[in-house]
Amino acid sequence: MVLAFLEHPEATLHMMGEECGGDEIFSHSLNVTVLCMMLAKGLELTPEQARTLGLGAMLHDIGLMDVPDRLLKLRPDEYTRPERDLRARHCEYGLRIGKQLGLPADILAIIFQHHEMVDGSGYPLGSKQDKITLPARIVALVNYYDNLCNPIDYAQA
């Protein structure tokens, strides 16, 4: 995992900065990364597959850098429809940022697809299982799990 971060230090540093939601976003990304690495071991992924999964997991929310900070401090039930749509665009923003950073296509797919659901109910495209890469499906599952286990304390945000 450390080697993957060293390959793309600028991307990892972006995730740690205040411009990307600060400590809470970084902690969430780290949780998702660690859980994904545990799954990679259990699924007996190759070292290359695990590296891709780990880096994609760490950077899955990098697009939040381009979402206004005030939206990151609102509870989801407080969003207006346009605000919800704007936050949902973080997948697209992440894809753009990842391309600017020169990230490989398999990591870009994780960043772009990490809110897709196998039944087609996710976003940004509403893709179904066969159109979502396996690493993106793993990150989506772990992302959802971490959000359930560690809800954001919006009073502190």
Which ranges hold each PLM region?
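Active-site-flanking alpha-helical
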Residues: 67-68, 120, 150
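Active-site-proximal, acidic helix/loop segment immediately C-terminal to a metal-coordinating Asp/Glu
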Residues: 146-157
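Charged catalytic carboxylate motif
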Residues: 31, 93, 137-140
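Structural signal for well-ordered, non-membrane alpha-helices
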Residues: 94-95, 119, 146
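A ubiquitous short alpha-helical element
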Residues: 19-24, 78-80, 126-133, 151-152
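Histidine/acidic-rich helix-loop-helix segments that form or flank divalent-metal centers
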Residues: 57, 85, 98-100, 104-140, ...
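Acidic/His-rich, divalent-metal-binding segments that scaffold phosphate/diphosphate chemistry
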Residues: 1-88, 95-102, 106
